[in-house]
UniProtKB/Swiss-Prot annotation:
GO biological process: argininosuccinate metabolic process; L-arginine biosynthetic process; urea cycle
Pfam families, sorted: Arginosuc_syn_C (PF20979), Arginosuc_synth (PF00764)
UniProt EC number: 6.3.4.5
Gene that produces this protein: argG
Name the UniProt record assigns to this protein: Argininosuccinate synthase
Pathway assigned to this chain's UniProt record: Amino-acid biosynthesis; L-arginine biosynthesis; L-arginine from L-ornithine and carbamoyl phosphate: step 2/3
GO cellular component: cytoplasm
Gene3D superfamilies: 1.10.287.400, Argininosuccinate synthetase, chain A, domain 2, HUPs
Catalyzed chemical reaction(s): L-citrulline + L-aspartate + ATP = 2-(N(omega)-L-arginino)succinate + AMP + diphosphate + H(+)
């Protein structure tokens, strides 16, 4: 059976991921007029730029949907966001500033929960607004078929008839007006924005040019901290984790993880924390550029990693970072629920996150400028007396112990010296004139 439909399946139930914007509104009305039985599904992802979610299903029914459903995805989204923090599932960074994979996390939740809701209504054909050049078309494809193996995909933006009739936003606006809906296009921005409770993505249009920077972006989750007229005061923040779960901010305990994340967003957003400018490789290996916001993710990530480094040993931290980068890439590719991702994620949650209990006190300033003021945990393995430069009683080790430890290093030093001589004899290394320092053959100079 063909999975991807190239033309509208007339007379059949077709579910559309409906945002209420011009694109999906025009698509829904067009599909209805062409003979499809339209069902609209809207994900409440806690988008910071969405004023009234309850209005969206009503609009869908006005445009011809037989049924319009609002699916509350916020709790699941926060659950996945915390799992990503616990497992360090972030592979894109520039100069130590991280992209927190907030859009891939949103797609994992949307793609599974909306298709599950459609399946309950007997809807086995799904359409959404993703284009053929982006990542989302593959992410939604994977998550949709994982959730419903009988699913078929119909995307208006892959249907040549739809493109010919309503190929651009101007045509869509004119179409809606002609049908009596007087749908006006929103003011055209210099970039496009996609957001959820975890973060916001700004990309495309002017941001495709690398000489257009972060300063053209109007943040929706924080403040434009780069502007001189933006007043940002330093703020002390205390973040508490219990067995890997964030539980309290500034002494206030949260039983609702969504409420905690909203507060973390508010705190981090006051400073512009978590904004980054990244060049990344899309799934199809072409590079794209985005400006990202994730104030709450950044705040929790900083505190979590501080506790990780104070609690776990070096080899555990190394595996956490290596596995986290691999897991981040799988998440980005739409494989968050694949077995290889679940294996990496569960390992980190069990053996790394479970030990992370404690409080971290930070001072937030402008943007990603912060200081860590204090770290407390009953599980800390940081013991300053072990390495104190002062004289201490019951020292962990003595000078004689260190002499013995260094003497044992003679074994591998001798082996290394032998290997360096071998490499020199074979021409891989050379010694510079008048020096015993080895150089790689192609480093001569």
């Amino acid at each position: 059976m063909t999975t991807i439909l190239k033309s509208l399946p007339k007379g059949e139930k077709v579910g559309i991921a409906f945002s209420g914007g011009l694109d999906t509104s025009a698509a829904l009305l067009w599909m209805k007029q062409k003979g499809a039985r339209c069902y609209a599904y809207t994900a409440n992802l806690g988008q910071p730029d969405e004023a009234d979610y309850n209005e969206i299903p009503r609009k869908a029914q006005e445009f011809g949907a037989e049924k319009a459903v609002l699916v509350d995805c916020r709790t699941q989204l926060v659950h996945e966001g915390i799992a990503a923090i616990q497992s360090g599932a972030f592979h894109i960074s520039t100069g130590g500033i991280t992209y927190f994979n907030t859009t891939p996390l949103g797609r994992a939740v949307t793609g599974t929960m909306l298709v599950a809701a459609m399946k309950e209504d007997g809807v086995n054909i799904w359409g959404d607004g993703s284009t053929f050049k982006g990542n989302d078309i593959e992410r939604f494809y994977r998550y949709g078929l994982l959730t419903n193996p009988s699913l078929r995909i119909y995307k208006p933006w892959l249907d040549q008839q739809f493109i010919d009739e309503l190929g651009g936003r101007a045509e869509m606006s004119a179409f809606m007006t002609a049908q009596g809906f007087a749908y006006k296009m929103s003011a055209e921005k210099a970039y496009s924005t996609d957001s959820n409770l975890l973060g916001a993505t700004h990309e495309a249009k002017d941001l495709e040019s690398l000489d257009s920077g972060i300063k053209i972006v109007n943040p929706i989750m924080g403040v434009p901290f780069w502007r001189e007229d933006c007043n940002v005061k330093a703020e002390k923040v205390v973040v508490r984790f219990e067995e890997g779960q964030p539980t309290a901010l500034n002494g206030q305990t949260f039983t609702d993880p969504v409420a905690l994340f909203l507060e973390a967003n508010a705190i981090g957003g006051r400073h512009g924390l978590g904004m980054s400018d990244q060049i990344e490789n899309r799934i199809i290996e072409a590079k794209s550029r985005g400006i990202y916001e994730a104030p709450g993710m950044a705040l929790l990530h900083i505190a979590y990693e501080r506790l990780v480094t104070g609690i776990h040993n070096e080899d555990t931290i190394e595996q956490y970072r290596i596995s986290g980068m691999r897991l981040g890439r799988l998440l980005y590719q739409g494989r968050w629920f694949d077995s290889q991702a679940l294996m990496l994620r569960e390992t980190a949650q069990r053996w790394v996150a479970r030990a992370v209990t404690g409080e971290v006190t930070l001072e937030l300033r402008r943007g990603n400028d912060y200081s860590i003021l204090n770290t407390e945990s009953p599980n800390l393995t940081y013991a300053p007396e072990r390495l104190s430069m002062e004289k201490v009683e019951d020292a962990a080790f003595t000078p004689a112990d260190r002499i013995g430890q260094l003497t044992m290093r003679n074994l591998d030093i001798a082996d290394t010296r032998t290997k360096l001589k071998l490499y020199t004899d074979t021409g891989l290394l050379s010694g510079s004139e008048g020096s015993q320092i080895f150089r790689l053959e192609n480093d001569k100079g």
